[in-house]
Amino acid sequence: MSQEKKEELQSEAQVTKEETPQANEAAAEAEAIVNEFDLLQEELNSLKDKYARVHADFENIKKRLEREKYSAVEYANEKFAKDMIPVMDALHMALSSSSSIIDSAEHLEKLKEGIELTLKQLSTALEKHGITMVSHDAPFDPNIHNAIQSVDSDTVESGQIVQTFQTGYKYKDRPLREAMVVVAN
């Protein structure tokens, strides 16, 4: 071998020795990147799985709340209905007891008494659920009273209710039915 060839081989060997640590570093760095990529991929898959589970839980909760809301609306008047049952019982008892009473004066008095008690029971049940009668002692209010007539009156101030033809009712603050009244001029 010639001197030139020896020098060339030595320089190649030296270059290879110099490149080998760099190649090893590059390979190690590439392996580290691949490992980090694998870890990140696993974490991504785990997070996707968690997201899918949370989303499914959310949808289930949403459906359950919708069913509960529907049920609550469907049975919202259950307490009210239960409070009306005793009133119905009282009316049935009044009808059934009227056939056993022989004396007509006594019959009318007992029937009147039964109707008054039933009316009181009904008023109490309605008030318990926020349904009240519109006041007739207060000044005329177009939100809860319907003036069907106005009359001149010396005994009642102008704007006051003179007579009530039909009782009005409110549910809490909302009118259910306006009272039909006569108002003083």
UniProtKB/Swiss-Prot annotation:
InterPro entries in alphabetical order: GrpE, GrpE_coiled_coil, GrpE_head
Domain of life, per lineage: Bacteria
Biased composition (Basic and acidic residues): 1-20
Entry annotated with the keyword Chaperone: yes
CDD domains: GrpE
Chain spans, region Disordered: 1-28
GO molecular function: adenyl-nucleotide exchange factor activity; protein homodimerization activity; protein-folding chaperone binding; unfolded protein binding
GO biological process annotation, one example: protein folding
Name assigned to this protein: Protein GrpE
The gene coding this protein: grpE
